[in-house]
């Protein structure tokens, strides 16, 4: 029988509050008598911003460590794409030319959703060959709909852990249903969310998207270019799209970036090719 030795002798703050009736006396003595760590108004002050930064960094990090998650593959892309099945329903329900045009655009773009879903499946299948949890790669997304949902879904449907890093927005974005319970995190600060995207990332896979996807992509490219992080494969899915919307060659020709800056960028058209690049980069076999 294993000994039941405590890790330390200190009660947790929660245990102490429960045992002592917590902040009950604050009703008599006012807001100042609340325990600092239990005082929501105090923790929300501008002067305590640095502590909130630390908490948003620490909370997800501890949870991921407890699940032995050391490596992630981060998938970015539009929140607006839907599955082929959903797009086909939109086409069937369209009652005028405008709705039909929008529905057919959704149907065309659904190829990206299905590709991201397939990619999540490939990652999950690799993990099934790894008995050591610390060698596994896990899909990590922004936790919302569209491409984020698709990548989480592909891994989730294959029985794997998936991670979602959600953000609080004026128009609330709910986590998609394919994130593993306990691995859906909510951030207030974009900066801390971005830091968590990068901390464990072993590859970045980017599908077509809007401002948010561009922001996330170029943040990673800048961190690699300035040597703030080690080089890792940055994979852009739908080569024609990316070469059209971003003239990387023009940036090189005008000497705005170096040709070497593009060595980490890979243009692909399929989930299979995206996974092959990661497999070859890390010699996964």
Where are these regions (language model features)?
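Glycine-rich beta-alpha loop segments
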Residues: 2-3, 18-165
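C-terminal amphipathic helix plus adjacent low-complexity
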Residues: 4-8, 13-18, 279-285
């Amino acid at each position: 029988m294993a000994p039941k030795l405590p890790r330390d002798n200190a009660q947790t703050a929660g245990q102490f509050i429960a045992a002592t009736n917590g902040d009950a006396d604050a009703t008599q003595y006012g807001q100042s008598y609340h325990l600092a760590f239990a005082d929501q108004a105090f923790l929300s002050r501008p002067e305590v911003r640095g502590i909130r930064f630390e908490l948003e960094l620490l909370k997800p990090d501890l949870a991921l460590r407890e699940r032995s998650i050391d490596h992630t593959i981060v998938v970015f892309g539009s929140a607006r794409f839907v599955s082929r099945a959903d797009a086909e329903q939109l086409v069937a329900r369209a009652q005028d030319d405008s709705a039909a045009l929008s529905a057919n655009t959704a149907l065309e773009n659904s190829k990206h959703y299905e590709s991201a879903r397939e990619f999540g499946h490939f990652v999950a299948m690799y993990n099934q060959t790894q008995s050591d949890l610390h060698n596994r790669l896990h899909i990590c997304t922004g936790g919302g709909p569209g491409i984020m949902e698709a990548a989480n879904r592909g891994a989730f449907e294959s029985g794997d852990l998936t991670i979602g890093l959600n953000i609080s927005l004026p128009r609330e974005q709910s986590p998609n249903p394919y994130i593993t319970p306990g691995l859906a995190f909510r951030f207030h600060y974009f900066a801390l969310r971005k830091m968590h995207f990068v901390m464990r990332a072993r590859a970045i896979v980017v599908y077509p998207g809007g401002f948010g996807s561009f922001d996330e992509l170029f943040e990673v490219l800048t961190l690699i270019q300035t040597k703030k992080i080690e080089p890792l494969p940055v994979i852009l899915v739908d080569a024609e799209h990316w070469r059209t919307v971003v003239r990387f060659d023009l940036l090189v020709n005008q000497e705005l970036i170096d040709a070497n800056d593009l060595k980490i960028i890979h243009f692909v058209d399929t989930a299979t090719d995206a996974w092959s690049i990661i497999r070859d980069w890390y010699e996964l076999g």
